[in-house]
Amino acid sequence: MSIDSLTVTTIHIIPGGPMSRLQWGFAGTSSTTLKQTDPNNNVAEPIPHCKWAHWIDSQHDGPVTDEGDMYPQPDGTVLEKGSMVNPATGLMTDYEELWMDLESGSTTKDEMRWSLVLSLDDKLNRAKGMVIRVGEHVQGIMKNDGRITVERWVWEDSRLGVKDWTRKVRLGDDFLPCSVLFQPEGMHSGGKVRYGEFWWAIKELYHW
């Protein structure tokens, strides 16, 4: 079965948490190149240099980029060192972030793993958004006429002792089609999903 468009007609209104809990949210694309070894950091191999383009950003209305060098750590994490404009000061500022990889597990008996991207770009209503699923994780962000909404879901043991999707975070009061990605069978790249008042485009869909 192939679905060109899907309409979700029932949406349960669940108030979100206070936006004061969101320090920063963004979504977009990233690219990586290798740079020569930095002698000041005692790294023998070329260092990955990553650049993130923020297509949607809770702190800015226009496009934003940040970039940094990625240094593998002995415990398996990766230390990112870079610089970007500090939203609080408007000045270019150095920063450090520590990253950790997570497994992209399966949610089905056949051990199939899914990766999907939904994108919203409604210029008439000043609405932009992106919802992404990788394996057992779904999260998204939307900016609707200046209002920010974010959600995160994880496939984990529920209170009933069985695996199920659990919402870990919801801030803001608009609607994100996270639940649509729980059952992607029949969806295809290039299709559309109507959720609430908006049509979301299925930009990417993979399974392995």
Question: What do these predicted regions represent?
Answer:
Residues 1-25, 35-208:
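Lipid interaction determinants
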Residues 29:
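Catalytic phosphate/metal-binding cores of nucleic-acid and nucleotide-processing enzymes, i.e., regions
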